[in-house]
Amino acid sequence: MSNYIEIKGARVNNLKNVDLKIPRNKLVVITGVSGSGKSSLAFDTLYAEGQRRYVESLSSYARQFLGRMNKPECDYIKGIPPAIAIEQKVISRNPRSTVGTTTEIYEYLRLLFARVGHTFSPISGNEVKKHTVEDVLAFVKTYSEGTKFVILAPLVPVEGRTEAEQLKMSLLQGYARIYYKGDFQRIDDVLETGEEITGEVYIVVDRLSVDLSTDGISRMMDSAETAFYEGRGECRLMFMPSMITYDFSTRFEADGIEFEVPNDNMFSFNSPVGACPECQGYGKVIGIDPSRVIPDSGKSVYDGCVACWNGAKLGEWREVFCRYAAKDNFPIFEPYYKLSEEHRSWLWHGLPSADPTDPYSTVCIDEFFEMVRQNQYKIQYRVMMARYRGKTDCPTCHGTRLKKEANYVKIAGRSITDLVQMPIVTLKEWFANIQLPEHDAAIAKRLLTEINNRLQFILDVGLGYLTLNRLSNTLSGGESQRINLTTSLGSSLVGSLYILDEPSIGLHSRDTERLINVLKQLRDIGNTVIVVEHDEEIMRAADYIIDVGPNAGRLGGEIVWQGETKNLPSAANSSSLIPNSSLSQSHTLKYLTGEDAIPLPKSRRPWNMKVEIKGARMNNLKGIDVAFPLNVMTVVTGVSGSGKSSLVKGILYPALKRHIGEVCDAPGEYGSIGGDIKAIQHVEFVDQNPIGKSTRSNPATYVKAYDAIRELYADQPLSNQMGFTAQYFSFNAEGGRCEECKGAGVITVEMQFMADLVLECEHCHGKRFKSDILEVRFHGKNISDVLDMTIDEAIEFFTQWEQLDIVKRLQPLQDVGLGYIRLGQSSSTLSGGENQRVKLAYFIGQEKIVPTMFIFDEPTTGLHFHDIKKLLESFNALISRGHTIVIIEHNLEVIKCADHIIDMGPDGGDRGGNVVAVGTPEMVSGCNEGFTAKYLREKLY
């Protein structure tokens, strides 16, 4: 097998006949500016070919389920192993999928509880045991040899027989004596009396003395087995002469309850055996939503925290509750979020002093909604019920998804539900300290190894704040990718090609080092790891770097530099530089060698106005007060899970939007919002969602440049002659578009059992328009030619012919580093980072926009150092127009350029949720708490 993956003549997208040799079993970073061709090389060439060859090696039966994969456009690729792509996308939309099921940790937990879990009675708390013949023998051995005892079996009449009839059958089977009414009696003597047999009757199966010889043990075991059979699973030992008895049962029962023997399906919420019967394993049902009943937990019961108890008439419920609550010392003036679980239970389910004979004393939230249900024949009560209904935790399983029997099974005092609700960092500590009995430890050894390894992998990629019951569809793209990475590590595949797309997204600098170790582990077990990445730490930790460029689009697609990382410092003079190329062409090497850098601002912008959030309590936020300065760039930092998104996306954005009268989802829990809110007239969350709901949406239509282009073509002489208006040059309206493909340029053929086929339209050949429309030209270019231009090409073309209005609308796209994308490129093909920057370009192009707060969530996703510089210039342009920028970010190049930093932490999950430091980068870097300061100091000084 070759030591290299050899690519010859790669021509996918903008790649320019690339020849490349990539070392196998190494950690390789592919880098370059946005649009340079990195993804074309990594995913559209390497992954596509590796996956295609693997699929072709399968049987024809297996291939029919996987669909046909096209061969990437290149001369040949040699030495490529089976490829696995781990991309930035949410891996599952299945509402049943969790972090535990995705990483397979939950499967091991199920097996662990099925094998070594011990069942405890919910009534007495005693362990429930199912006895065997061996248990009986072991107990007998505790007595000294020669001790006399009797093995008894309870008389269990067969259905339809009386006790007397059953005794006759026992007599026929060879049994002679019974234990009845406190004495041993012969069966025939009891039957001769003719009296009705009542009370407990035990058949004497055998009379023995403790004998530990082989024959003695064999006889004891045979007799015990017979007793279990005759007694329908029950057996009693009676020792002489004390008459002390001990009961044994092969039935799994205690306290009058028959329990289910633990098995792995019992702990599966995807199996009808283990799933809660009420919610079918989803954990949620449609019911009374606590967040709607108590929308503001900062209020007390007295102040009206229970929304349905407000108003002139319904307010009587609050008054009655407050009056009766005094008996139980319920704190009616305490904010709801400070109430103990016990006090919350009283409010919802009833006071402990409630008297069923006094209806007023039973007032509580449950009673209120019971009253509403009884009056639903009235429209106002039906409306009220609808107002407070929503998805809420299942009342039967309390959101655990499992039936109650699963929680009776415990290991070291914990049920499986307890474990999946722990943050992974806490769960890892619990497993590290677990003490099991010797027998259980031997059975669980392999399972514990797998669980501990997978938990450690999750910690290594910086996701220790997650819980195993966290839904997969609530994870960010970066979190999903890293969860997928840990799954790959846990599977221990070797000889594969792993291709990752920016695994450092959403990762604080503190966690990058641990991520690097994970990537190296993947390499060390015998895999080739290729990472498309811009993070400097990961680049320097790689074995080999491939720099694609030098620029984007048609100015990219070449290998500017490749070589071992150790050659980087002297790259300018290295013989490994590609001929006819130089260090000056590689933006990556310029930054890595210090020749170029993102400069620090000469000064930090001062501010005197702010928006202030008080008492933020959403998720893990600890009731914090935070001020966001206006007309400056504020960066919210902190490790993953520290509360950044909860503060900014969960509270600031919706609260501010509602305050200025715009429709928005309900914000998370907080006390109040104040400050200079009137200075903000609009708030915009610039996310990474597609710029349009339709695949027809493209950058030119989004920034309104296409309207001007259509007007230009409608003004051409041939258009005037033919009567073509601007509408004829739209692919969204009838007239000039190709009606065969409806202006899409492609036709989608739905396949019944395979992936849909997307074929070029045979009528317009992908041009989107009718032939007579394509005859209209502006300086030699028809409308289809213009849509195929990149932003850079279009600006150059329209500038040459003085179409300044079009240039003005396209210029912001170039300013934010998107000069390489095509005007007509479908929004569905843009990455999240590209979508975000198209939106940013739109706002930059708006001249008369009112004072706005722009909120960005990791805008540097997918950006090279060179592109970040352009992005910061765009931010400065918005601020200079009187706008405010708030950014959630981990990238130190952006953080060091902030005017104001809000550092959250100090850690993730329960250990986060506080404000660690605020102020300028210089002020924050001097803080000794949290993790941001340490890394920021290295960038500032």
Residue positions per predicted region:
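Conserved phosphate-binding elements of NTP-dependent enzyme cores
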Residues: 1-941
